[in-house]
């Protein structure tokens, strides 16, 4: 077996490298375009829960880097690190073993306009800055991809917000979810 050691590959008629490499991360660019498809979410697989695995407390109480906020409801929401099993088709097949589980408490008076329960993740500015996404430009994009399962079939809402510089908000919808079915 032969080994060729290089840090770049360039066509004999080329004026710039077609592929660049480094010793720690392999291929770093193709035709000058950086490979930026890495996950920006720290603990996005919910494997670390230093504070505990279940709580009704708000803020950072279970899964690291993820915060629960709620208010107005009859009974507090519960947050938990939930162990997935092979019956959790979808995320299990992709190697995920945990989820961040939110249980809405018994709302005997029904949902009111001011009731809310949401998850917050605060991405680090350095990760957003190195992602290649220019959140101030309408022609720059980032992909938000996640698995979701709900016990109630309906459309759910969320948003991405940045507080770097001028605050920017980007709302999104899950689309109509089927009850108790994992969707990506």
Predicted regions and their residues:
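Extracellular and organelle-lumenal recognition/adhesion modules and their flexible linkers in secreted
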Residues: 3-184
């Amino acid at each position: 077996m032969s080994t060729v050691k290089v840090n770049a590959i360039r066509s004999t008629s080329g004026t710039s490298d077609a592929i660049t490499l480094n010793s720690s991360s392999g291929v770093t660019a193709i035709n000058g375009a950086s490979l930026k498809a890495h996950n920006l979410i720290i603990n996005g697989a919910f494997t670390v829960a230093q504070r505990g695995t279940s709580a009704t407390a708000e803020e950072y109480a279970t899964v690291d880097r993820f915060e629960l906020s709620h208010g107005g409801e009859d009974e507090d929401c519960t947050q938990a690190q939930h162990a997935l099993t092979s019956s959790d088709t979808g995320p299990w097949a992709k190697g995920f073993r945990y989820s961040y589980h939110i249980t809405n408490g018994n709302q005997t008076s029904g949902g009111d306009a001011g009731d809310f329960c949401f998850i917050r993740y605060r991405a680090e500015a350095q990760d957003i800055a190195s992602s290649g996404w220019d959140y101030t430009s309408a022609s720059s994009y980032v992909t938000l991809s996640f698995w979701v399962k709900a016990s109630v079939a309906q459309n759910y809402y969320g948003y991405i917000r940045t507080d770097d510089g001028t605050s920017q908000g980007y709302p999104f919808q899950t689309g109509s979810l089927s009850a108790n079915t994992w969707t990506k």
